[in-house]
A protein has these predicted regions:
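Hydrophobic, helix-prone linear segments
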Residues: 1-65
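Intrinsically disordered, low-complexity, compositionally biased regions/tails
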Residues: 9-12, 21, 30, 34, ...
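Serine/threonine-rich intrinsically disordered cytosolic regulatory regions enriched
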Residues: 16, 159-161
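C-terminal boundary/linker segments immediately following FHA domains
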Residues: 17-21, 47, 105-106, 111-153, ...
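Generic hydrophobic, helix-prone segments enriched in Leu/Val/Ile
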Residues: 30, 50, 142, 149-151, ...
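Short, surface-exposed loop and linker segments with low hydrophobicity and enrichment for Pro/Ser/Thr
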Residues: 34-45, 93-98, 138-147, 195-196, ...
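Short, solvent-exposed loop/edge segments of extracellular or virion-exposed proteins
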Residues: 52-54, 152-159
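Forkhead-associated
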Residues: 61-124, 162-230
Length: 239
């Protein structure tokens, strides 16, 4: 299934993402935020889905240590794959100031067609094979420690996305091939970044942020929608 060019559904109709009524004790709950008088939005935690119009869908993971395994009902893995693999097949760790990525096999794992028996450092362009699933690891931006895992062949995540972004310091959306998410259009860039355990964004041109016009950036939440003349995206809970 190719999602390129498809416009994703609006992410404001599910009460688990954008709430029309407050949860219990919302005044004392730091995980919720009143964006307007009518909507209460839930703070981003460790994972989210990003739908970028006319580009695709992405599973974005924020933690430094992630589990990879088979997608099953009730599965607790961070990166669930629809493939013939173990329920907990491998661990992926981000370490050090340089943002080294280490994969630890919990079941048979191949890197560049060579089976690994111990934690192994990943390099830009490495192909990782886990059972019937194949992923390509890339560090697209030289000044960011965030990375990508691109699905090869019939490999799929659940829910379906085009790639996994391993977000460390920043996630850059733009028309440069070194960006983490690339759109093919005129020059424009939106950067997502973490600050004080909050997910924020900044844009090099004004955007509509959750219905607020002419914004240059702000905090993002589950259910947030960001729209500019060239880039539009929405965020959803990854469950």
């Amino acid at each position: 299934m190719n999602t390129t060019g498809l416009k994703r559904r609006q992410a404001v109709t599910n009460s688990t993402r954008v709430l029309d009524f407050p949860p219990p004790n919302v005044a004392n709950n730091g995980h919720y935020f009143f964006r307007t008088n009518e909507k209460i939005m839930k703070a981003i935690s460790s994972r989210f889905l990003m739908w970028v119009d006319a580009v695709g869908g992405y599973l974005v993971c924020l933690n430094n240590q992630l589990s990879i395994g088979q997608a099953r009902p009730g599965s607790k893995v961070d990166i669930p794959l629809l493939a013939d693999i173990s329920s907990k097949h491998a661990r992926l760790k981000r370490e050090g100031e340089e943002g080294d990525y280490i994969i630890e096999p919990l079941a048979p794992v191949l890197v560049q067609n060579q089976e690994i028996k111990s934690p192994t450092l990943l390099h830009h362009g490495d192909v990782i094979s886990l059972g019937t699933a194949e992923l390509q690891f890339t560090n697209p931006h030289p000044l960011s420690t965030s990375a990508r895992l691109d699905l090869i062949g019939q490999s799929r995540t659940s829910p379906y996305t085009d790639a996994i972004v391993l977000m460390s310091d920043t996630l850059i959306i733009g028309n440069n091939m070194a960006n983490h998410i690339v759109y093919h259009g005129d020059e424009h860039q939106i950067v997502l970044y973490l600050q004080n355990k909050k997910l924020l964004c900044r844009s090099d041109q004004q955007v509509n942020l959750d219905g607020m016009m002419e914004q240059s950036g702000g905090e993002l939440f589950y259910g947030s929608q960001v729209k500019s003349d060239r880039i539009s995206f929405s965020l959803e809970d990854a469950y």
